[in-house]
Amino acid sequence: MTARASQDSAALPLDKETLLTVYRKMRTIRDFEERLHVDFGRGDIPGFVHLYAGEEAAGVGILHHLNDGDRIASTHRGHGHCIAKGVDPVAMMKEIYGKKGGSCNGKGGSMHIADLSKGMMGANGILGAGAPLICGAALAAKFRGKGEVGITFCGDGASNQGTFLESLNLAAVWNLPVIFVIENNGYAESTSRDYGTAVDSYVDRAAGFGIPGVTVDGTDFFAVHEAAGEVIRRAREGGGPSLLECKMVRFYGHFEGDAQTYRAAGELDDIRANKDCLKLFGRAVTQAGVVAREELDTIDREVAALIEHAVQEAKAAPQPGPEDLLTDVYVSY
């Protein structure tokens, strides 16, 4: 296992334009999730919702390296991955509201957003189910020979699923261009890591499959971006799979409505005060003198307007009708 420490923000590795793009992505995810928290609480949104707020640095830090030809498989907590991969937030909002014009025409909902045109193979309500899917996508990419990669995300709990471990072995044996990302927020629903696994770090398992593994501070965008860049480059060059663990925090419960009685007193207050990846990123780029606070404030206002527009579009969109019942049932591609 290789542990990677947080990077000194005094020497930022990205130019100003890229930093502003990254901030916009992270802010869009945060505001998107915060608005869902409010609207779900009002009863406006059907089904279940699992929010990515607090984890933005990992999704954006990793997926910033990808293009539309690269494939990803997400999780039940997948809104952040979708936005980071380039899926339209308006189409996503319609999907979550269960409306026509959504990314899956309102039939998938929060846990099953997909957009193949962006390489987003889909979020998945089944824990660990993205791993075998991305192995198939990575095998196809290997045959095409264009240097494309696949990335699958899962939580710390899902990494104990048999499908995940079997996929690690398959990817290693076939030398597939795939990166397995464990987003370790410390809880498998309400079960802490200590109750779910005996290893000190999830990447300790990588050696057993003959692949490299790296652990990073998932609240530090720059640490995630650097580590992800290395394993993605390795995969593009034919070096095979890697395991990347991002130690991170989530601002809300496992699902909306989770009472979070498993958390220690004051834990959430500490997380929001000291481990907010968006604040940490903003502080790093402004203290380095690369970006002015006013520029970030402008992005904040623009993103707020985008999210409000997305919500209004979703509310105004029609529901799927009886004529839609048998469409999208089968797929052939």
From Swiss-Prot:
The keyword Oxidoreductase applies. Pathway: Ketone degradation; acetoin degradation. One of its GO terms (biological process) is acetoin catabolic process. This is Acetoin:2,6-dichlorophenolindophenol oxidoreductase subunit alpha. Its cofactor is thiamine diphosphate. The keyword Cell membrane does not apply. SUPFAM superfamilies: Thiamin diphosphate-binding fold (THDP-binding) (SSF52518). Coiled coil: none annotated. It comes from the Bacteria. It is an enzyme of class 1 (oxidoreductase). Catalyzes the 2,6-dichlorophenolindophenol-dependent cleavage of acetoin into acetate and acetaldehyde, in vitro. The alpha subunit is probably the catalytic subunit of the enzyme. It comes from Cupriavidus necator (strain ATCC 17699 / DSM 428 / KCTC 22496 / NCIMB 10442 / H16 / Stanier 337) (Ralstonia eutropha). Pfam families: E1_dh (PF00676). Its EC number is 1.1.1.-. The lineage of its organism: Bacteria, Pseudomonadati, Pseudomonadota, Betaproteobacteria, Burkholderiales. Keywords: Acetoin catabolism, Oxidoreductase, Thiamine pyrophosphate. Tetramer of 2 alpha and 2 beta subunits. One of its GO terms (molecular function) is pyruvate dehydrogenase (acetyl-transferring) activity.
